[in-house]
Design a protein with these regions (language model features):
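Hydrophobic h-region of N-terminal signal peptides that target proteins for export
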Residues: 10-19, 332-334
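Auxiliary, metal-adjacent structural segments of Zn-dependent hydrolase domains
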Residues: 21-91, 109, 114-119
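Metalloprotease/metallohydrolase-associated module, dominated by Zn2+-dependent proteases
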Residues: 23-38, 125-232
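Small-residue-rich helix-interface/hinge motifs
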Residues: 82-137
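Outer-membrane beta-barrel translocator/channel fold
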Residues: 120-131, 301-399
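Short loop/turn motifs that connect adjacent beta-strands in outer-membrane beta-barrel proteins
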Residues: 166-176, 244-267, 289-295, 319-327, ...
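C-terminal membrane-associated helical module and adjoining short loops/tails
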Residues: 185-303
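Outer-membrane beta-barrel "beta-signal"
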Residues: 280-288, 314, 359, 391-410
Length: 410
């Protein structure tokens, strides 16, 4: 009874405090890490989406006849293939290489030698890749971080993207291919790529080496991958926004659906797995839309064949403090097995409980047709693994500009 009362009061407070507002941020942080890349990449996609809504026609034949039914979808498909596909692949691939693998190597004290970008099929059949120089002191778990970093950074990017899409409850087609690439970078790569040098295969071999046995078989990881691919409803909405709503119907965006629990409360579950330096964690994400608020609760745990680990995470977006000031809150607590890594040639060991909390303050200057303002993120993380953050403990400080430009055509 007491728990229900506390929950009711809590939900009432966050409901009263204003209206949801998706926003895009151009931020800076000292280490130029994965959150820096994720926020700024989403801002780039928003700018491209806004320019597309103003400048690109959805049809070249205005009359409603058989020619329009055939020609207009061909025009839209050609535009998608020759611009969206190539631009999206470049942004997401370079994010994977530079701010994924590259960031984790720089964090370990190594250096980036070169990054080679190869265009996607059918233009080439070669993978893009990064060459790096390893530091003298480098643990196997830092090797695991380097291997998982590419897919990890695209999880960070699509977490930001998903948050904005759910706040608006609309999926603009210009984000569709990016979401499919980023959110499925880890499960898709794991399920379908068989090259022995591929990151998931190297990761699995490193985990088995770490524990001196074979707790991770390829068939098990493929099973987790297919579950993740087919239990994310956002994959369906991304495909629909691109191939049905845009190409066939000529729409700029489409409404997404959530499970209606009441007149005020909606719900969207999804499953994914995350690679960590101690093995994959299975993650159960739950998004709640309460009136105009978005809340996320997640729980994750290790595979049964690996050392025990668990994590509880909560995010709340858009707590309105005044007409101009809003607040986002993020926190997580975990229990992790042993992690060893070098920093500045000093061996650091972490095991057991850890926490991370971040508060984001948004100050809006203008809220007419377009939104402009400032954002500041401040928080703390203890030593241990959290997606997108450094391994070592320390303060988290990020800041920059926020904006949202109104689309001309929807």
């Amino acid at each position: 009874m007491k728990t229900k009362l506390i929950l009711t009061i809590f939900l009432s407070i966050i409901t009263i405090l204003g209206k949801a507002q998706s926003r895009y941020s151009i931020i800076y942080e000292k280490q130029l890490g994965q959150n820096f890349a994720g926020e700024n990449s989403n801002a780039v996609f928003h700018l491209l989406d806004y320019a597309d809504s103003l400048l690109m026609p959805k049809q070249i034949i205005k009359a409603e006849n058989i020619f329009a039914i055939v020609i207009n979808p061909i025009f839209r498909f050609s535009k998608l293939f020759l611009s969206n596909y190539l631009i999206t692949d470049y942004i997401m691939t370079m994010n994977h290489e530079r701010f994924g693998h590259g960031y984790r190597m720089l964090e370990a004290g190594g250096s980036i030698d070169k990054i080679v970008y190869n265009m996607p099929p059918p233009f080439t059949n070669e993978f893009s890749y990064i060459n790096a120089t390893y530091p003298v002191n480098f643990t196997i778990q830092q090797e695991l971080m380097y291997r998982l970093g590419g897919s990890e950074t695209n999880l960070v990017l699509t977490d930001v993207m998903r948050k904005n899409i759910l706040l608006d409850e609309r999926f603009n087609y210009n984000f569709g291919l990016a979401y499919l690439y980023g959110s499925n970078d880890m499960p898709g790569y794991t399920a379908f790529v068989t090259n022995p040098a591929a990151d998931p295969i190297q990761y699995r071999q490193n985990i088995n080496q770490l524990y001196g046995s074979e707790p991770l078989a390829r068939d098990k990881m493929k099973a987790y991958s297919f579950i993740a691919l087919f239990t994310d409803p956002m994959n369906f909405y991304a495909l629909k926004s691109v191939f049905y709503d845009y190409i066939i119907k000529g729409r700029h965006s489409s409404k997404i659906g959530m499970i209606k629990l009441s007149n005020r409360l909606k719900y969207l579950p999804r499953f994914r797995f995350e690679y960590t330096p101690y093995g994959p964690e299975l993650v159960y994400q739950n998004y709640f839309k309460l009136d105009y608020k978005l809340i996320q609760f997640s729980f994750s745990h290790s595979d049964a064949a690996l050392p025990d680990s668990w994590r509880v995470l909560a995010n709340i977006w858009n707590i309105k403090l005044s007409n101009q000031i809003s607040l986002n809150l993020s926190g997580q607590i975990w229990d992790q097995p042993n992690i060893e890594f070098y920093q500045n040639d000093k061996l650091i060991t972490s095991e057991g409980f850890g926490v991370q909390f971040i508060s984001t303050v948004n100050y809006d200057i203008s809220k007419d047709k377009n939104l402009y303002g400032f954002t500041l993120q401040a928080g703390y993380k203890s030593t241990g693994y959290a997606v997108g953050e450094q391994l070592n403990k320390g303060l988290i400080i990020r800041g920059g500009l926020t904006f949202k430009l109104g689309n001309k055509s929807l």
